[in-house]
Amino acid sequence: MNPATDPVSAAAAALAPPPQPPQPHRLSTSCNRHPEERFTGFCPSCLCERLSVLDQTNNGGSSSSSKKPPTISAAALKALFKPSGNNGVGGVNTNGNGRVKPGFFPELRRTKSFSASKNNEGFSGVFEPQRRSCDVRLRSSLWNLFSQDEQRNLPSNVTGGEIDVEPRKSSVAEPVLEVNDEGEAESDDEELEEEEEEDYVEAGDFEILNDSGELMREKSDEIVEVREEIEEAVKPTKGLSEEELKPIKDYIDLDSQTKKPSVRRSFWSAASVFSKKLQKWRQNQKMKKRRNGGDHRPGSARLPVEKPIGRQLRDTQSEIADYGYGRRSCDTDPRFSLDAGRFSLDAGRFSVDIGRISLDDPRYSFDEPRASWDGSLIGRTMFPPAARAPPPPSMLSVVEDAPPPVHRHVTRADMQFPVEEPAPPPPVVNQTNGVSDPVIIPGGSIQTRDYYTDSSSRRRKSLDRSSSSMRKTAAAVVADMDEPKLSVSSAISIDAYSGSLRDNNNYAVETADNGSFREPAMMIGDRKVNSNDNNKKSRRWGKWSILGLIYRKSVNKYEEEEEEEEDRYRRLNGGMVERSLSESWPELRNGGGGGGGPRMVRSNSNVSWRSSGGGSARKVNGLDRRNKSSRYSPKNGENGMLKFYLPHMKASRRMSGTGGAGGGGGGGWANSHGHSIARSVMRLY
């Protein structure tokens, strides 16, 4: 069908539609059956075809004039759904011959699509079944609602070529009445929806005005009936709206009356909750009384039957511990549920489980008697003396070594500590007279006497270590004395440490009448004595006065080389007294003539005195030994201390000059030679 062939459709196309409110921007789409059409939503051509099918089914036997409304409705729908971009051809024309009623276009809404086979089976093969995606109703925006409200408030009759606006009812614009009954409200909503569908399905309900102002009405009989029903339904709503206008006081009274029953209900609900809690609390109290009223005596084996499987709330536990089902350190109730199953299965273990139950209760103790620090017994009131367990062995001091195998225990009457009978002390024989002397043991108690009289294996190792350390120190001293590198200063210091009383640690070297030297008995080492009769080497043992330790002699190659070197140097500087920088400087006394045996007394210094009378050479090196750090050599002047060559006293020079038989001229030569060297080197005279 072509709308341009019909004069009525041409006039409708010439009419300009009223200005529509701006719609939100939507993307335009095209239809597969009508690719040239651009629209938003669904295709208007397809909609016109559907409406034409409906008109043909409803008005199949009517005249040709009755078929005009579908063509007009198709033109109106195309004008509505096409994008308004071509205003020159079919756009807005306010000065046309006729105008379409403005209240018509906002009222158009989509309806549910259905197949043509429902109405007429003859058209089932012509039209395809429609998709249900196009059945969604278009939502009315807020702008459309405002425009509908403005149109509804306009005057109903306008003359002079104006548009006659008839008020129409819309479910969106009209207020919805609140009904207390939900069933009635649902039924009313369904009826209103059916009325809306019937109202908006009829698309031929519109009015057109001519130039002369005559109204051209094109409507069917069914449309008139629908309007009458709607108008009849509107009248009672207006009456209800007038009746609802009441003062505020009435609303307050009504609200108070409605709230009173709710308060009553809340009170009864709170009372019921409180009664339930009170009932639970009473039940818990009864369970506690039953549990605490049981017999908790140690000898009782009766179990509380009322105790449930789950653990009950204890007085010393919190609610968190109840949910954790774990035992706390502050539990006071015994546990019966764990061992209850064993009573029925194993009768032989019945007594053992009873003991476990009683031991699990901290208020009753079945511990065995044990010794405490003060000697009392713990738990001895629970059993008679005959039923008590034997006490544990006594707590002895820490013994690192194994104790002796034989012990004589004496059982005490109070059953507390075993006591060892003290063994008689062994007799000690005095070595001086061979008579056994009584042993005096320190300490007044038996334990200290046992400690001192017992063997060293029973003593603590701390004292053994201390005594062994003393022995090791003494052995080290002996080893140091045996070494050939020991000096006289170290020997004298050891002698002073040992406690020997000597006059300023001095020793005398005396000359006999025959020219030989007599040495004290404490001098250690080799002695080479050269006499006029024979050249013999006398070797004898030195000994310590206090310690009583005998040291063997030790002659080393190193000593011999050192002594030979010193002898060689003394021959060059004969008769000189050699001193180190650290040595003391006492006066040297030479009494008597050369044969009279001069006497020299020395202090804490190393003295090497040589007599050159009668060709006899005597080397005294009893304690003339030096360490590696202090020994010196004529070849190595940097190693060791410097040597000062000093002369004898004047008296000794004079005596040596007038020397007797043993002196000779050798002594004067040595003294004069030493004096000349001292004068030339030291510049002292």
UniProtKB/Swiss-Prot annotation:
What is the annotated quaternary arrangement, including any partners? Interacts with VCC.
Q: Where is the composition biased (Basic residues)?
A: 280-291
Q: Which InterPro entries match?
A: OCTOPUS-like
Question: What do mutants without this gene show?
Answer: Short roots associated with both reduced cell division in the root meristem and altered root cell elongation. Early emergence of lateral roots at the root-hypocotyl junction. Reductions in the complexity of vascular networks in cotyledons and discontinuous phloem differentiation. Impaired primary root protophloem differentiation during root development leading to altered phloem long-distance transport. The double mutant vcc ops exhibits a complete loss of high-complexity vascular networks.
GO cellular component terms listed in the entry, alphabetical order: apical plasma membrane; chloroplast; cytoplasm
Q: Where is the composition biased (Low complexity)?
A: 601-611
Q: Where is the composition biased (Acidic residues)?
A: 179-202
Give expression by tissue.
Answer: Expressed in provascular cells and phloem initials (e.g. protophloem, metaphloem, sieve element precursor cells and sieve element procambium precursor cells).
Post-translational modification as stated in the protein's UniProt record: Phosphorylation at Ser-318 amplifies the promotion of protophloem differentiation.
The UniProt family comment states:
Belongs to the OCTOPUS family.
Give the start-end ranges of region Disordered: 1-34, 152-202, 280-314, 419-471, 584-640
| Effect seen on changing residue 318 to E | Slightly reduced activity. Normal plasma membrane localization. Complements the ops mutant
Q: Which PANTHER family match?
A: PROTEIN OCTOPUS, PROTEIN: UPF0503-LIKE PROTEIN, PUTATIVE (DUF740)-RELATED
Q: What does this protein do?
A: Potentiates primary root protophloem differentiation. Required, together with VCC, for embryo provasculature development and cotyledon vascular complexity and connectivity. Regulates roots architecture. Mediates the recruitment of ASK7/BIN2 to the plasma membrane.
Q: How does it sit in the membrane?
A: Peripheral membrane protein
- Disulfide bond sites: none
Its recorded name reads: Protein OCTOPUS
The residue stretches assigned to a coiled coil in this entry are: 549-578
Q: List Phosphoserine occurrences by residue.
A: 318
Mark out the compositionally biased spans (Basic and acidic residues): 292-314
Swapping residue 318 to K leads to an effect described as: Slightly increased activity. Normal plasma membrane localization. Complements the ops and brx mutants. Strongly increased activity
User: Does this entry carry the keyword Coiled coil?
Assistant: yes
> What is a biological process (GO) this protein takes part in?
cotyledon vascular tissue pattern formation
